[in-house]
Amino acid sequence: MVSFKAGINLGGWISQYQVFSKEHFDTFITEKDIETIAEAGFDHVRLPFDYPIIESDDNVGEYKEDGLSYIDRCLEWCKKYNLGLVLDMHHAPGYRFQDFKTSTLFEDPNQQKRFVDIWRFLAKRYINEREHIAFELLNEVVEPDSTRWNKLMLEYIKAIREIDSTMWLYIGGNNYNSPDELKNLADIDDDYIVYNFHFYNPFFFTHQKAHWSESAMAYNRTVKYPGQYEGIEEFVKNNPKYSFMMELNNLKLNKELLRKDLKPAIEFREKKKCKLYCGEFGVIAIADLESRIKWHEDYISLLEEYDIGGAVWNYKKMDFEIYNEDRKPVSQELVNILARRKT
């Protein structure tokens, strides 16, 4: 069986695409990219997908072979190069993490049925591929609490287990897969569950000047790691709506801070005696490269220390790129760290 320790995300291909076109889907990721990933030393990829790739709102329950072919070919490439594949639904019927405020998934039984039916179909399709593929239920749930999420999650697990009793299922907590929310997940008696979290701490370093974050754009500072945030008092004084940022004043950005922020996940595992996986982590590409390398070095060392697998965000583009358009790494040192190659 393949390993799921050192992975990389394929965001932007069949999820979060800028244009829904055959040309994009045929060219954004090819076999050569999977070969590049394998040669670098990674052992798996995380493949986000959006449901419109495989199901149209006009033909519910009819699954599109042309869209499914992209998952199929990625799986075949992964098998060829001995990589694992985590199949992650990024955009579900009625839910997308970017638009969670307008979500209908958790209140609409029809959307919930569609959601579970898609996974039921995929479980049947890939029932003989469990040595290479794992399913991740849904990316970055944001709900007032975990009640409705737990209910849907248990329905999903029940549906999958009626088809396949040993497929690995990756389950994340509320609030963008926060480590702090793992403890609020429903108890699951299943030996083939992996608990998934995301890690982008400290946020105003990993997301500095991120164009999609109002607060990061407002702060608009270059942040180094290790280091400290600069000008917090002045910023809050001039922008009182961000008063919550005063807690960042004089905060030391270093490995011990990362360890502290990772602690809820470690404590959860100690209590549950379960497997952990970090489905996303990373630093925005506009950050200082030396700082970017050092953050990843520190974080990977913690994942190694605590024996946690994970997948960096992101292989290319998506503002967090590890490789450029020519499949050249932004830094070979960074790739070696991420692939957990000892140098």
From Swiss-Prot:
What Enzyme Commission number(s) apply to this enzyme?
Answer: 3.2.1.4
Q: What are this entry's molecular-function GO terms?
A: beta-glucosidase activity; cellulase activity
The alphabetized list of GO BP terms reads:
cellulose catabolic process
Q: Which Pfam families match?
A: Cellulase (PF00150)
Residue ranges spanning the membrane: these are: none
Kindly identify the residues recorded as the active site.
140 (proton donor), 280 (nucleophile)
Q: In which pathway does it act?
A: Glycan metabolism; cellulose degradation
The record's GO CC annotations read: cell surface; extracellular region
Return the PANTHER family for the record.
ENDOGLUCANASE, PUTATIVE (AFU_ORTHOLOGUE AFUA_5G01830)-RELATED, GLUCAN ENDO-1,6-BETA-GLUCOSIDASE B
Q: What is this protein called?
A: Endoglucanase C
